[in-house]
UniProtKB/Swiss-Prot annotation:
UniProt domain F-box: residue ranges: 2-49
Paired cysteines (S-S): none
Organism: Arabidopsis thaliana
Domain of life: Eukaryota
InterPro entries: F-box-assoc_dom_typ1, F-box-assoc_interact_dom, F-box-like_dom_sf, F-box_dom, SCF_F-box_component
Protein name: F-box protein At3g19880
One Pfam family it belongs to: F-box
């Protein structure tokens, strides 16, 4: 009879590479050897071969994803507790996910898929209007949530500290920028947003008019808990004029930016050689005339993308103009590799693919216990209400 200890390490690694992300925790209890190998995977010592691990959104539900050059290998819906939650947005940082619920009040859930732990978080304010979120961490690896409110003339943001279970509020005085897209990416614990700068110019009547620049970058530094200065992109483009642009992280260490101009069928991708909250340098990664390999994509609408630096490939997710049908294109330099039909999906605010190259985390995020004094007070109130009825 063959024992688990008799299996070769290569075979065990192959088995572990096929284990759903959300089941890795159970694997560790199988035997000491498997426990050690799964720990290596957590610490990025042994990475899955030739595939990306991540999560994707299907009809407001979060599911795990494996993607390689042959396409999507499997779509496993996550734990029952998360499957019951309709999610509108998902953000990722260092093994944890932030899920924004689809309900009107937009509650927050922070989730560790590996440990199977979740924490529901009450938001601090009832401010209405456009807002966006991000999940990051400071230099001490403490996870934090950013909630940003922007309108034409002001910016207000709140920060939730996962470790202390507390919110803080901040104002940006007279911002000359605003964030009105959910286009952002996480690098080294900080979030980089696409934004626009406002500039005052004099017209022919010597009156001042406000104009906006094409897209630029701005970083939110989770250690300093503030926005940095403007960062340049390797090219100019303007989403308001029909250009398509997107951001993606590369193993949480580099930033990639994609461009497709409204009047061209060329996809251009650049990646950073250095990036910090106040400095960035770029190099070209990939430039493909998609008309020569796919034909004219008149209905191309960028949803999200990620890259494989070693193979010099990009996986670009697109939706049609109705945002109901999703397609993944695996493309390389001057050649088309594969097209994967993802089927019909409901329109989402969050990209269909949340991120790739997921790495499990051992960070504990169990629901914060309610202090006994507060719990007893709540019970007394509940009993009182019962008597009144």
């Amino acid at each position: 009879m063959t024992m688990m200890s008799d299996l070769t390490q290569d075979l065990v690694e192959e088995i572990l590479s096929r284990v759903p992300i959300t089941s890795l925790g159970a694997v560790r209890s199988t035997c000491k050897g498997w426990n050690a190998l799964s720990k290596e995977r957590i610490l990025c010592i042994g990475e899955p071969k030739q595939q990306f691990l991540g999560f994707m959104m299907l009809d407001y539900r979060l599911c795990s994803m494996r993607f390689n050059l042959h396409g999507i290998l499997n779509e496993d819906f996550v734990s029952i507790s998360m499957y019951q939650v309709e999610t509108s947005q998902v953000f990722y940082c260092a093994g944890l996910l932030l899920c924004v619920t689809r309900e009107k009040s937009s509650r927050l859930i922070i989730w560790n898929p590996y440990l199977g732990q979740t924490r529901w978080i009450n938001t601090k304010t009832t401010k209405t209007g456009y807002n966006t979120y991000a999940l990051g961490c400071d230099n001490n690896k403490n996870h934090k949530i950013l909630k940003v409110f922007c309108d034409d003339y002001q910016c207000y943001y709140e920060i939730y500290d996962v470790k202390s279970n507390s919110w803080s509020a901040f104002n940006v005085t007279d911002p000359n920028w605003h964030i009105d897209y959910d286009i952002c990416a996480l690098v080294n614990g900080n979030t980089y947003f696409l934004t626009k700068e406002r500039i005052l110019v004099e017209d022919s009547d010597e009156d001042e008019d406000e104009v906006e620049t094409p897209e630029i970058l701005i970083c939110f530094d989770f250690t300093a808990e503030r926005f940095g200065k403007f960062l340049h992109l390797p090219f100019q483009f303007d989403i308001d004029f029909g250009d398509t642009g997107g951001l993606s992280c590369v193993k949480e260490e580099k930033l990639a930016v994609l461009l497709k101009r409204y009047d061209q069928n060329v996809i251009e991708i650049w990646v950073t050689t250095k990036i910090e909250p106040n400095v960035v340098f770029w190099k070209p990664f990939l430039k493909v005339d998609i008309e020569t390999v796919l034909g004219a994509l008149l209905d191309f609408q960028l949803d999200s993308f990620f890259i494989d630096e070693e193979k010099k490939l990009a996986v670009v997710f697109s939706s049609n103009k109705s945002k109901c049908y999703k397609t993944a294109y695996i493309i390389g330099e001057d050649r088309y590799l594969k097209e994967v039909d993802l089927g019909e999906c409901k329109p989402l605010r969050s990209p269909i693919v949340c991120f790739s190259s997921y790495v499990p985390s051992l960070v504990q995020i169990n629901q914060i216990a309610v202090p006994k004094r507060r719990e007893n007070k709540r019970k007394r109130k509940s009993k009182g209400k019962g008597r009144e009825v």
